[in-house]
Design a protein with these regions (language model features):
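Glycine-rich phosphate-binding loop of actin/hexokinase-like ATP-binding domains
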Residues: 49-51, 57-74, 80, 220-294
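Conserved phosphate-binding loops in N-terminal lobes of ATP-dependent enzymes
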Residues: 79-178, 400, 404
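Conserved phosphate-binding/catalytic loops in two-lobed NTP-binding clefts
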Residues: 199-213, 434-461
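Glycine-rich phosphate-binding loops at beta-strand->alpha-helix junctions
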Residues: 175-190, 415-437, 448-453
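Phosphate/ATP-binding catalytic cores across multiple sugar-kinase/actin-like superfamilies
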Residues: 14-33, 149-167, 218-230, 378, ...
Length: 518
C-alpha cells in the first residue's frame, strides 16, 4: 500500500484528487532540479517518451512529450511523438520507427524486420530468429527479443540525449520505464538487462506498471482535460484501469481514499499474464477473413499448404488485417453515440489493396480484399465473450473478460463496487470493447484520456520525477500471483500471498526446514 502524508484536511469535505495530495512532500526540493526526469512507455506497437519537470511559477508538475527523429527508408528525416516499435534492415542500414514500419509490407518478419518483440521477452529459447540477417556474423545482432529490445533502446537513448542537449536541459537523465502489470519476473529481467546494456540505469523500483502510470497521468490532466476525481467523505472509490494495447490486456484495480495519514492510493489486484492484445484481433482477421479469401482469389484450397507455410502466409497478412481493424474502428467511432452500437444503421466496408505474398504455389495476389462491419462485429464477439476464450483452427483467442473477472475476484470486490473505469491503450478505443464494458459495468463512470497512447509515458515521467527526485512511490507495485513452494509432502506453502505490496517487510516462516538426505 502507498500511503503518503497529506497534512491537515477538512473533515466532512470531499477531496479533489491530485498528484500533490498523493505525494505530499517538500516540493521546494524540486526547484532547480539537477536532472532531467524521463519516462518511457515501451509499447508493443508504439513507444512514447515524455519528461516531467516542476513549474515553480505554477507550483505544479508539467509533462511534455519528446518528439523523436526518425529516418524514412528513402533517407528523408521526420519527427514524431509516436515511435513505432519496429526495427528494419534495409539497403544496408538499420531503420527504427516510421521508416521501418512502412516496410512491413515488403520485408519478412524476424528476418529483416522485427516488431511485437516486447511480448517475447523472457523466453529462454536462445537464438529464436533463425532466419535473421543480423546474425552472429554481424556487429549488430538480432537473434531474439532481448537483442531486438537492446538495439531499439540504443537508438532511443541516442535520440533522448539529442533532445535533452538541443533543449538545453540537464544532461543527467533519470529514467523510469513503464511495463505491463502482468509482466512476469523473467520478462522484467530481460528488459532491465536490455536497458543496462545501453547504460540506461533503471532500478526495479523505477519500473512502473502501465495501468499505474496511466492513473498518475490522468490525475495530473483531469483538472484541465478530463473528469476530476473526488474522494467523498467516508468513501474509498475503486477504479479499474483497463489497459488494452497491441500486445497486452492489463487490468489494475486501485483504491483511493483518505486515512489518518492523508490521501492514499493502493493496488488491490492486478491481472495475471494472458496472451491477449490488439495483435490477436489482427491474427483472427488474418486467419478467418483474409487467408480464406486469398485462397479463393488464387484458385487454391486450404489443403494446398502445410501449417508452417500457412503461418508464414498469415504473418504477411497481419499488416493488412491491422489496417482493416483500425479503419473500421475509426469509421464507427465517427458516427456512433458513445457506448451504444445500436445507433449504427448502415453497414460499413473497409478495403485493403495490392496484396502480393510469395509461396510454394507462386505469388499469391489480390487486387482488393475487404471486411464489413458485420464481419467485424462477429470478430469482436470472440474477444468480448463472458465465458472465456475460443480455440479455432488450432489458434487460441482469449477474451478481455478473463483478465477483468480474475482481477475483480482477486481484489475481493464485485462489479457493483467499481466506481470508475479508465481506458488506456490504442486497443481500448475499439468501440466494441467500450460498448461491451459499458453494458457489463452500467453504473461505473468511464474515463477517457485525451490521448491514450501518450498517457502512459507521461505517467512514467511523473513517476521518474517523484521517485528519482523525492524517493517516493505513489502507487506501490504488488504481486499478481502468490509465491509458493512445494514441500516434501507435496503440500503447497504460500511464502508471499497475491496482492502483497513490493518491496515488503521481512516475512518470517518458522515451520519450514530443508531436509538433509543421508
Amino acid at each position: 500500500m502507498s500511503s503518503l502524508e497529506l497534512g491537515r484536511y477538512d473533515e466532512g469535505m470531499a477531496i479533489l484528487l491530485s498528484i500533490k495530495s498523493l505525494a505530499t512532500a517538500d516540493w521546494k526540493q524540486l526547484k532547480g532540479a539537477e536532472a532531467t526526469y524521463v519516462g518511457i512507455d515501451f509499447g508493443t506497437s508504439t513507444t512514447v517518451v515524455s519528461y516531467s519537470y516542476y513549474d515553480e511559477l505554477l507550483d505544479s508538475i508539467k509533462c511534455d512529450v519528446i518528439p523523436i527523429r526518425q529516418k524514412e527508408y528513402d533517407g528523408a528525416m521526420s519527427k514524431s511523438e509516436k515511435l513505432p516499435t519496429v526495427i528494419a534492415l534495409y539497403d544496408n542500414q538499420i531503420l527504427v520507427g516510421t521508416g521501418a514500419s512502412s516496410l512491413k509490407y515488403e520485408l519478412e518478419k524476424n528476418k529483416d524486420i522485427w516488431y511485437s518483440f516486447k511480448m517475447e521477452l523472457g523466453e529462454d529459447l536462445g537464438p529464436k530468429y533463425y532466419n535473421s540477417t543480423l546474425n552472429r556474423e554481424k556487429s549488430i545482432q538480432i537473434q531474439n527479443a532481448k537483442d531486438a529490445t537492446s538495439v531499439f533502446f540504443r537508438f532511443l537513448k541516442k535520440e533522448i540525449e539529442n533532445f535533452v542537449h538541443t533543449k538545453g536541459l540537464n544532461d543527467n537523465i533519470k529514467y523510469a520505464v513503464s511495463i505491463p502489470a502482468s509482466f512476469e519476473a523473467n520478462q522484467r529481467r530481460d528488459l532491465i538487462e536490455a536497458l543496462s546494456i545501453n547504460q540506461i540505469d533503471v532500478s526495479k523500483q523505477a519500473l512502473i506498471d502501465e495501468p499505474n502510470a496511466a492513473f498518475l497521468s490522468y490525475i495530473l490532466d483531469s483538472d484541465t482535460f478530463g473528469e476530476a476525481i473526488t474522494i467523498p467523505n467516508g468513501i474509498n472509490p475503486k477504479m479499474l484501469v483497463f489497459d488494452f494495447g497491441a500486445g497486452t490486456c492489463d487490468i489494475s484495480i486501485l483504491e483511493i481514499g483518505v486515512n489518518r495519514k492523508g490521501v492514499y492510493s493502493k493496488n488491490l489486484s492486478i491481472s495475471k499474464f494472458e496472451k491477449l492484445g490488439g495483435d490477436d484481433i489482427d491474427r483472427y482477421i488474418a486467419y478467418n477473413i483474409l487467408y480464406p479469401e486469398l485462397l479463393v482469389q488464387n484458385g487454391l484450397d486450404s489443403d494446398d499448404f502445410i501449417m508452417s507455410e500457412k503461418r508464414k502466409i498469415v504473418n504477411n497478412l497481419l499488416v493488412f488485417a491491422e489496417k482493416l481493424k483500425i479503419g473500421m474502428c475509426k469509421a464507427i467511432n465517427l458516427i456512433w453515440e458513445k457506448y451504444d452500437l445500436s445507433t449504427i444503421a448502415q453497414e460499413y466496408t473497409i478495403v485493403v489493396k495490392d496484396i502480393h505474398i510469395e509461396s510454394s504455389k507462386g505469388v499469391l495476389s489480390s487486387s482488393e480484399m475487404q471486411m464489413t462491419s458485420i464481419q467485424f462485429a462477429e470478430v469482436m464477439k470472440v474477444f468480448t465473450r463472458k465465458t472465456g476464450g475460443v480455440i479455432k483452427d488450432g489458434q487460441e483467442y482469449n477474451s478481455i473478460y478473463q483478465s477483468i473477472k480474475s482481477s475483480i475476484k482477486k481484489s475481493g470486490l464485485s462489479t457493483s463496487d467499481i466506481d470508475y473505469v479508465l481506458f488506456i491503450g490504442g486497443s481500448s478505443m475499439n468501440p466494441y470493447v467500450q460498448a461491451s464494458l459499458k453494458k457489463w459495468l452500467p453504473n461505473s463512470k468511464l474515463l477517457l484520456p485525451c490521448d491514450t497512447q501518450e498517457h502512459v509515458s507521461k505517467g512514467a515521467s511523473i513517476h521518474s520525477l517523484i521517485y528519482n527526485a523525492l524517493g517516493l512511490n505513489i502507487v506501490q507495485p504488488i504481486t499478481s500471483e502468490p509465491i509458493c513452494v512445494v514441500t516434501q509432502n507435496n503440500e503447497l506453502l504460500t511464502l508471499v500471498p497475491a496482492g502483497m505490496t513490493m518491496p515488503t517487510d521481512i516475512i518470517e516462516i518458522d515451520n519450514l526446514a530443508v531436509a538433509r538426505n543421508g
